[in-house]
Amino acid sequence: MEVLMAERANLVFHNKVIDGTAMKRLISRLIDHFGMAYTSHILDQVKTLGFQQATATSISLGIDDLLTISSKGWLVQDAEQQSLLLEKHHRYGNVHAVEKLRQSIEIWYATSEYLRQEMNPNFRMTDPSNPVHIMSFSGARGNVSQVHQLVGMRGLMSDPQGQMIDLPIQSNLREGLSLTEYTISCYGARKGVVDTAVRTSDAGYLTRRLVEVVQHVVVRRTDCGTIRGISISIRNGMTGRILIQTLIGRVLADDVYMGLRCIAARNQDIGIGLVNRFITSRAQPIYIRTPFTCRSTSWICRLCYGRSPTHGDLVELGEAVGIIAGQSIGEPGTQLTLRTFHTGGVFTGGTAEHVRAPFNGKIKFNEDLVHPTRTRHGHPAFLCYIDLYVTIESQDILHNVNIPPKSFILVQNDQYVESEQVIAEIRARTSTFSFKEKVRKHIYSDSEGEIHWSTDVYHVPEYTHGNVHLLPKTTHLWILSGGPGPCRRSIVPFSLHKDQDQMNLQSLSVEQRYISNLSVNNDRVRHKLFDLDPFWKKKGGVGYSGPDRILSNGHWDFIYPAILHENSNLLAKRRRNRFIISFQHDQEREKKLPPRSGIKIEIPINGILRRNSILAYFDDPRYRRSSSGITKYGTIEVDSIVKKDDLIEYRGAKELRPKYQMKVDPFFFIPEEVHILPGSSPIMVRNNSIIGVDTRITLNTRSRIGGLVRVERKKKRIELKIFSGDIHFPGETDKISRHSGILIPPETRKKNSKESKSKQLKNWIYVQRITPIKKKYFVSVRAVVIYEIADGIHLATLFPQDLLQERDNLQLRVVNYFLYGNGKPIRGISHKSIQLVRTCLVLNWDQDQNGSIEEVYASFVKVRANDLIRDFIRIDLVKSPISKRNDTAGSGLIPVNGSDRTNINPFCSKARIQSLSQHQGTVRTFLNRNKEGESFLVLSSSNCSRIGPFNGLKYHNLTKKESIQIKEDPMIPIRNSLGPFGTVPKIANFYSSYQLITHNEILLNKYLLLDNPKQTFEALKYYFMDENGIIYNPDPCSNIILNPFDSNWYFPHQDYCEETCTIISLGQFICENVCISKHGPRIKSGQVLIVHVDSLVIRSAKPHLATPGATVHGHYGEILYEGNTLVTFIYEKSRSGDITQGLPKVEQVLEVRSIDSISMNLEKRFEGWGERMTGILGIPWGFLIGAELTIAQSHFSLVNKIQRVYRSQGVQIHNRHIEIIVRQITSKVLVSEDGMSNVFSPGELIGLLRAERTGRALEEAICYRAVLLGITRASLNTQSFISEASFQETTRVLAKAALRGRIDWLKGLKENVVLGGMIPVGTGFKGLVHHSREHNNIPFEIQKKSRFEGEMRDILFPHRELFCSCLETNFHDTSEQSFMGLNDS
């Protein structure tokens, strides 16, 4: 004490806060200066002093001391504003769900972090002696993060799965939480409690395994004699702190020279003074000894270990450094799991650096070196692949910035930037060892409707036949509003017959039904227009012509409108290369004959028919059914597998020789009654029960047939089937197929059967096995309806004879098609018949004379003569009359004769220009249904449109050879004569007036805001246009019912066409907030359905942005229910840096799990190094040195990876502890060839050095390869079976050891503890060690020579090589087989 008092006068008073790190430094310096005993005396004084001061201070914590930071209000408000803006962008379809989540989390995380940083200065300025402030930085209780939750904001929490909840808790614990915030907080708090329990046990288990691996590693010798070392270069940009941490306490493996002068000798331990000399002198690469370089097998020497971390001298002999290493790595995990108040992982791939403009100016860079992209927040940016030089110039200053590769440029070229504006974002450096994981995020539909998208999609490879599509580029997915049929509460009663059929008002069947499954291949739709049957007219049905949609079955690629003429005759005339087919309507004949199926003529909208396309089809009433069922067709054969019962089974469309011969190919229809009910409706019958005819199934449905009831519950609906027929309980000897049903032909019976002949089958039957739950199975036997398709259909009865003659290059042939797939269930709706087979007329033409023609042009022609209207089909064998040309100046019709374009709108730049040549237009007149004789100008070519008014353009008529001049009349607005936007589109099937679904004029008046109800039919002149600019009539009667009462319609009633800002085409999707006119309303998002002169009707839709790589669940046009999965995003997310989350990472690295990236990287490196070194040095040497380098590389990567996890939490663990663990993981090799049958067996794990020494002793090469063991496997593969048995799998280990006759030499600690022997560690250990021969007495020359020989031996035959041999042995004597085995392994 006197000495301390005497020296105190000379010391400077040091007024500084001492935290844990500073205390460590102080204690280590005290030990260096005064020794251990004196230091402990001083620390006792410091402890006493601390307790005295704390008692005198008497800090107590009250609720008034929790002061909320003043700037919190506007910070939270600002974050809320950003979140609202983000939500708006998401609604507009500008950012997708993952970008929104990511940005939202970063906004709130940044706000929370800023508040946390503000907390300390705020306390320091307002209340420096605040107990909360003093205690939060004392390290005694609580930390900044917890105090921040008391006075800042609670922030973001994790859900039970560890994912972030993007709704932050804005309150702090002082203000109190709202109910929602409390619920969210409970998630995180509960997760914290559970994590603490689970992860604490994990950490304990990790420590146990670590200690188990290295418990036998003890310092047993002073020097192992190795001359190997790891080089550390000072020039490679290491920071001083990391260099000092790496070097201090190590031992040099070689002399260090500065020029010719030796500044440090081999085997000298490195202190702080020596490190400073190395740094100042910029010495050559320094070689140090590490546990990796030690020559020993199961122990370590003093010089390879270095200084002891406890007292700073070389480690003592007998010190159990293995156990210290295991506990050093395991202990931080155990301690740090108690940090329950973690904020969880944040969605950052490392915080990105921002480059800011130093002053105001204009920015310039080379646009060719960048390409546009999206940032991870969905903002537009440019990505540069190589170094980009950016120049910022103001009036008199030039500033150059070099942007590194893979960075985002956030401004445009030649843009004016302000000072401190962010101009670029540099990607955070992500090494191969950063912990990232791929996360799938499913986006669910929050509304129901029809799904559309605006790009091509690919099928995901594993779902080629499913409905999962992969997006190749960024697109919008649209959910078009409208419920699935009348299961919605609608005021107007509708009937839903088959898929996408006509909706008839006041129809006979107004039952509520669901739509049956859509079976569509190419996701396109074709239309046909039809006149209603006289039957409907007599019954008082609505008599207007309505459109009808039928799904195509994969043979067509266009949207077809077709015209159906009931009971009409076809008259065909031909002139040269044209077909003209006239339609005659025979009124008299219609009265006499019952209505029969007519021939439907199909012509695509654009009028182009390709080779082998279907021109017309005929539905034969013989193949028509009114009930649901299943069709089966294909070759019939006797099943050869079930010989016992001789059953006939359907064999698909395989080309097999049928044993059961038939004259014509039959197909079978198995009828069944099907009811599709809503999921919530009560069912009054049980599954697998038997009911009679007219049994009540639900409250308002009765069965039409009797039989077996089968109920299948699907998502949101119930499918109820009734099978008519017999039930048969088979005996034990009967074998019934477990798979699909079996068709049995008539006149077959069981062999050796004692049944009478009357029980033999007279008709085909369909046998199906049914297995109820917990009951014996039984068999349903149903009758089958057989249809035979005769070859000799009299074509003359269907089509006029002269139509079928092959003449004038055009051919028509008749083909039969099945409309339903084999074995596919057919869902029929009541009062609607199902067509099974369709007879089609296929169009073809001779290729010889018109070799280049791949498509013909078909059109309907109306000829009016003597007040009689005749319809003709004309087929022209000419090429498509459209030629396309791109022009960046504007959009307009460009006549080929070169007249000037006029009035081109400036906003139409870079649009597609479509030119019309002089003789390729056709003028036709269309008569309206009300025979008012209005005529329209129609161009007979698709995709022909013009924007803006235009003057005097000529269109030539092919038929009349005269040109029609259109002149602009100043009295008539141009848009009235030329369509809504001054376009001249093709108009197909135009009606002068059309109604919405309802006939109620008052309702229309209410919704369309018309002044006079009488003007309704005159006012509603609707156009309907697809994306090609073709206008046809609107089709409100699709499978989605657009009901005005469900607010699916939106009418912006404004004269917006005066100053149109954007081009509107019908069928176009418009995002919300897009301005379509200067003074017009901001419209909702949706699809333009109907365009009127001064208003348009939009079907509301919801956009979802999807980026490339996302998968869409569903077909184009499919109905999506609320809650269905819409799209799945896959994105990379940095795993949380929290230690409780970090522990599994450490464990994965130490266990060398295959799920982690490390083993993959290391395996690639093994191969890479081997190939490179083999290429340089030849086969044997290259392979050996390559293996040596690979193992060294794996050492470094494992150490760095584990260190990174702990350093991220501010935990410092010395490298040598981790090195000892990693050394044990990599110390085993796998014998790969039976080269030494007497010693090792193939596949055996042996120590590396043991294999080397055995090879040297026997002078024979051993073939083996390096393996990475996990800590658990390493624990179970030690030299001591007692140690292994006390770890885990005790019975197995002891049994194996007994069978092999293993001997335990009791070298480690654990086996001695188990058996109660003396532990071979500690200070008394020195007496037990027999000193090996000392190297110190060898003369210097011999020592140098032996060192040189050792170096050569280490280079050529390092102790971790794959072949062990000696220098004395001639290398070429080694058998070639060993090398062959090496290559194979």
UniProtKB/Swiss-Prot annotation:
Keyword Cytoplasm on entry: no
Tagged with keyword Signal: no
Binding-site list for Zn(2+): 224, 294, 301, 304
Record's subcellular location: Plastid, Chloroplast
Gene Ontology terms for molecular function: DNA binding; DNA-directed RNA polymerase activity; zinc ion binding
Any single Gene Ontology cellular-component annotation: mitochondrion
Record field: catalytic activity: RNA(n) + a ribonucleoside 5'-triphosphate = RNA(n+1) + diphosphate
Pfam family, one: RNA_pol_Rpb1_4
Biological process, per Gene Ontology: DNA-templated transcription
Top-level taxon of origin: Eukaryota
Primary location: plastid
Enzyme Commission identifier(s): 2.7.7.6
Cofactor names: Zn(2+)
UniProt keywords, alphabetically: Chloroplast, DNA-directed RNA polymerase, Metal-binding, Nucleotidyltransferase, Plastid, Transcription, Transferase, Zinc
Binding note for cofactor: Binds 1 Zn(2+) ion per subunit.
Family (UniProt): Belongs to the RNA polymerase beta' chain family. RpoC2 subfamily.
PANTHER family, A to Z: DNA-DIRECTED RNA POLYMERASE SUBUNIT BETA
Subunit record text: In plastids the minimal PEP RNA polymerase catalytic core is composed of four subunits: alpha, beta, beta', and beta''. When a (nuclear-encoded) sigma factor is associated with the core the holoenzyme is formed, which can initiate transcription.
Protein purpose: DNA-dependent RNA polymerase catalyzes the transcription of DNA into RNA using the four ribonucleoside triphosphates as substrates.
HAMAP family xrefs: RNApol_bact_RpoC2 (MF_01324)
Protein name: DNA-directed RNA polymerase subunit beta''
Species of origin: Illicium oligandrum
Name of the gene this protein is made from: rpoC2
